[in-house]
Amino acid sequence: MFTGIIEETGTIESMKKAGHAMALTIKCSKILEDVHLGDSIAVNGICLTVTDFTKNQFTVDVMPETVKATSLNDLTKGSKVNLERAMAANGRFGGHFVSGHVDGTAEITRIEEKSNAVYYDLKMDPSLTKTLVLKGSITVDGVSLTIFGLTEDTVTISLIPHTISETIFSEKTIGSKVNIECDMIGKYMYRFLHKANENKTQQTITKAFLSENGF
């Protein structure tokens, strides 16, 4: 479990592909202070497991399904990535509940600076936006953010200069792809209500069918 508060940015040191899977080695410093084999680290919002580490870098393995569902294929040696360690039970909770299980990707279609904030439009599949609400939470490349605009296929977010400077958003341009994790509470609520409506419809159809057939 993560919070969406980025601890530092790291640099891709190497990418080794094996078929559709890959191993990433990432150079960093702060998050290695108490790292152990098997620890979970969110890399651009993707929960990955540490398989090896030294004093200034760590390695994670990435399954084919994860590669396919995320923007990892867009990374190259030298790319910057957002990093966050799994939340400690006694730590502060500054963002929102983030699982590190990416739901899909989005494309940045607008970047506009207004006063002390920068607004980004993120175009994504409508299957993602249906679980979202205005002023609700969304995770973008591992960063916990608030939704300021919402249509069927576009989400608008806003970042202050501090967040931009402390994350890889400083390198984003129009056309950049980002990882999206929808708020898990919203997903559970949508699933619950959707199933409830399905059951209600099925029950109504069953009663009507029986009545029409003399039962």
Curated annotation (Swiss-Prot):
What InterPro entries does UniProt report for this protein, alphabetically? ATP_synth_asu-like_sf, Lumazine-bd, Lumazine-bd_dom, Riboflavin_synthase-like_b-brl
Q: Which residues bind 2,4-dihydroxypteridine 1?
A: G4, I5, I6, S144, L145, T146, S158, L159, I160, P161, H162, T163
Which Pfam families does the record cross-reference, listed alphabetically?
Lum_binding (PF00677)
GO biological process terms held by the UniProt record: riboflavin biosynthetic process
Q: Could you say which residues form the signal peptide? A: none
UniProt-listed Enzyme Commission number(s): 2.5.1.9
What keywords is this UniProt entry annotated with?
Repeat, Riboflavin biosynthesis, Transferase
MF-aspect GO terms: riboflavin synthase activity
| UniProt note: pH dependence | Optimum pH is 7.4.
* Top EC class of this enzyme: transferase
The catalysed reaction is: 2 6,7-dimethyl-8-(1-D-ribityl)lumazine + H(+) = 5-amino-6-(D-ribitylamino)uracil + riboflavin
Residue sites binding 2,4-dihydroxypteridine 2 per the record:
C47, L48, T49, D61, V62, M63, P64, E65, T66, G100, H101, V102, K135
Q: How is this protein's activity controlled? A: Is activated by sulfite ions.
Highest taxon, organism lineage: Bacteria
Q: In which pathway does it act?
A: Cofactor biosynthesis; riboflavin biosynthesis; riboflavin from 2-hydroxy-3-oxobutyl phosphate and 5-amino-6-(D-ribitylamino)uracil: step 2/2
Summary of subunit composition and partner proteins: Homotrimer. Can interact with 6,7-dimethyl-8-ribityllumazine synthase, forming a lumazine synthase/riboflavin synthase complex, also designated as 'heavy riboflavin synthase complex', which consists of a trimer of riboflavin synthase enclosed within an icosahedral structure composed of 60 subunits of 6,7-dimethyl-8-ribityllumazine synthase.
PANTHER family from the entry?
RIBOFLAVIN SYNTHASE, RIBOFLAVIN SYNTHASE ALPHA CHAIN
Function as written in the Swiss-Prot or TrEMBL entry: Catalyzes the dismutation of two molecules of 6,7-dimethyl-8-ribityllumazine, resulting in the formation of riboflavin and 5-amino-6-(D-ribitylamino)uracil.
Q: What is this protein called?
A: Riboflavin synthase
Q: Which gene encodes it?
A: ribE
